[in-house]
């Protein structure tokens, strides 16, 4: 016997999770609905591998000299650095560039899959998670960006999120770049300070205008005593940035007018405002007013966005880990990234896309009761009488007949007795079990026990003697009538579930 000290400890790596059947079914149910909407819009599925050459990830690497920083990387036999994909956008850029001559332009695609982050895990922060992306490559007009926003709105509603419980918030990176240029932060030399400004604005919902003011200036001291160094902007520059974030009006037209005033005289900023105005016109033409909102506070953190940026936000309250009521918040976002594909091509390649955080959206739908898979029906289990190996072929025929009729079924293949088999069937959420002992076999019959009805009746019968004598929810039928009898039981259970859900 092996020494106990030699036993390997079973443990899950930090930042990763196992997914159980209900989670998998819920995810597939949700993603099937998303695919339906994307297909309706004329997007095509594509799949790229989990592994890419590290240099193909480009700006996704925080430090080019340390490829393991932020991504999971390894070297192959040729000493080429390979990495698990960090998101789904960089692999798409590589795929489009590699197949550019044969793909239709614009190229409209969607894909879902796992992405990996070599970062410190924490509550709600995982090293492996799923994204669902849609992108249009080769469309320079903001109509492609507007379409992304409208498609996301339709997706949320198809998933059961009511109008008024979500908003697609839209901004334009060019408008903010115009503001940054106006306060003297133009050019590559100010890239770090520009990024600090972006990060400060991104905290508007969390810290409010005064908190952002501190982050734009010398810095902010939080309640725990931790100090975050600010962007060190002068007061006049801070006021200009805050005027931009406060430009939201009562409606899109008012917001656009306010933004025009903020960037007046700056060509890049004015171009961005005009793009927002063009998108606003498309939203109205499509009937999306109120569902898609121009919002100057939207600043996606990724540096490669070059034009419109957008975010899908759920507006209903949930209870956080501290028992506080908070707005659920973002479940996805995206924008225009004209520079990503052109890294491979050496020529401008316009692109825009949207990414959904699958796990986060699943959590939202479960909170709303829109993703219930608790009524999943397990397989019918054909029990095997104790040590009855001679009649396995007979049991197997029953299972095959049920499967041919489209009924989920399995023959018990373990080595336990009848009591343990019944417990197994219960854990499998079996709707019923099929039993054939020697007496039933001689008579050409089978017993079918309705486990759902039996569980209900057991609550009404307190006397064990009465229970054994009444044998509730158990019927005996001819062996050739097995399929029809099982189907009747399953249909009755389905009707009961439908009635209970009303």
From Swiss-Prot:
Keyword NAD: no
PROSITE patterns, per the entry: AA_TRNA_LIGASE_II
Organism expressing this protein natively: Brucella melitensis biotype 2 (strain ATCC 23457)
EC category: ligase
Protein name (Swiss-Prot/TrEMBL): Histidine--tRNA ligase
InterPro entries hit by this protein: aa-tRNA-synth_II, aa-tRNA-synth_II/BPL/LPL, Anticodon-bd, Anticodon-bd_dom_sf, His-tRNA-ligase, HisRS-like_core, HisRS/HisZ, HisRS_anticodon
One Gene Ontology cellular component: cytoplasm
Coiled coil: none
Quaternary organization: Homodimer.
Top-level lineage group: Bacteria
Keywords, sorted A to Z: Aminoacyl-tRNA synthetase, ATP-binding, Cytoplasm, Ligase, Nucleotide-binding, Protein biosynthesis
A Pfam cross-reference name: HGTP_anticodon
Protein family according to the UniProt entry: Belongs to the class-II aminoacyl-tRNA synthetase family.
Catalyzed reactions per annotation: tRNA(His) + L-histidine + ATP = L-histidyl-tRNA(His) + AMP + diphosphate + H(+)
Predominant place of localization: cytoplasm
GO molecular function ontology, one term from the record: ATP binding
Cellular location(s): Cytoplasm
């Amino acid at each position: 016997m092996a020494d106990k000290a030699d036993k390997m400890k079973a443990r899950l790596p930090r930042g990763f999770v196992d997914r159980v059947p209900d989670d998998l079914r819920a995810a597939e149910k949700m993603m099937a609905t998303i695919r339906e909407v994307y297909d309706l819009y004329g997007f095509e599925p594509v799949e790229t591998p989990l592994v890419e050459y590290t240099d193909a990830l480009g700006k996704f690497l925080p430090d080019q000299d340390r490829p393991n920083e932020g991504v999971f990387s390894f070297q192959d036999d040729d000493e080429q650095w390979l990495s698990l994909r960090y998101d789904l956008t960089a692999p798409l850029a590589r795929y489009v560039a590699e197949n550019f001559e044969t793909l239709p332009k614009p190229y409209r695609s969607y894909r879902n899959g796992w992405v990996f982050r070599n970062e410190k895990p924490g509550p709600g922060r995982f090293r492996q998670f799923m994204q669902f992306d849609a992108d249009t490559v080769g469309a320079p007009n903001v109509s492609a960006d507007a379409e992304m926003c409208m498609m996301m709105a339709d997706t949320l509603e198809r998933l059961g999120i009511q109008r008024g419980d979500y908003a697609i918030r839209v901004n334009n990176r060019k408008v903010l770049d115009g503001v940054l240029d106006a306060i003297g932060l133009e050019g590559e030399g100010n890239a770090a300070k520009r990024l600090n400004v972006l990060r400060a604005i991104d905290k508007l919902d969390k810290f409010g205008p005064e908190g952002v003011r501190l982050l734009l200036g010398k810095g902010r001291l939080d309640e725990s005593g931790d100090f975050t160094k600010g962007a060190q902007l002068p007061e006049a520059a801070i006021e200009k940035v805050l005027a931009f974030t406060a430009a939201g009006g009562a409606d899109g037209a008012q917001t656009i007018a306010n933004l025009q005033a903020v960037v007046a005289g700056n060509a890049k900023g004015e171009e961005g405002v005009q793009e927002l105005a063009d998108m606003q016109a498309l939203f109205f033409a499509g009937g999306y007013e109120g569902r898609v909102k121009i919002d100057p506070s939207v600043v996606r953190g990724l540096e490669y966005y070059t034009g419109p940026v957008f975010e899908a936000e759920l507006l209903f309250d949930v209870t956080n880990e501290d028992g506080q009521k908070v707005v659920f918040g973002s479940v996805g976002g995206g924008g225009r990234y004209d520079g990503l594909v052109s890294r491979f091509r050496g020529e401008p390649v316009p692109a825009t896309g949207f990414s959904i955080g699958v796990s986060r959206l699943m959590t939202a739908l479960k909170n709303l009761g829109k993703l219930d898979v608790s009524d999943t029906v397990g397989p019918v289990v054909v029990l095997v009488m104790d040590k009855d190996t001679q009649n396995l072929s007979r049991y197997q025929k029953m299972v095959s007949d049920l499967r041919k009729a489209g009924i989920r079924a399995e023959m018990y293949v373990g080595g336990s007795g009848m009591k343990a088999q019944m417990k197994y069937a219960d854990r499998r959420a079996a709707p019923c079990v099929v039993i054939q002992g020697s007496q039933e076999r001689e008579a050409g019959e089978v017993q079918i026990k309705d486990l759902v009805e039996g569980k209900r009746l057991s609550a009404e019968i307190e006397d064990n003697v009465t229970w054994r004598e009444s044998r509730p929810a158990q019927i005996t039928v001819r062996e050739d009538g097995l399929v029809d009898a099982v189907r009747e039981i399953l249909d009755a259970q389905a009707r009961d579930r439908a009635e209970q859900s009303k």
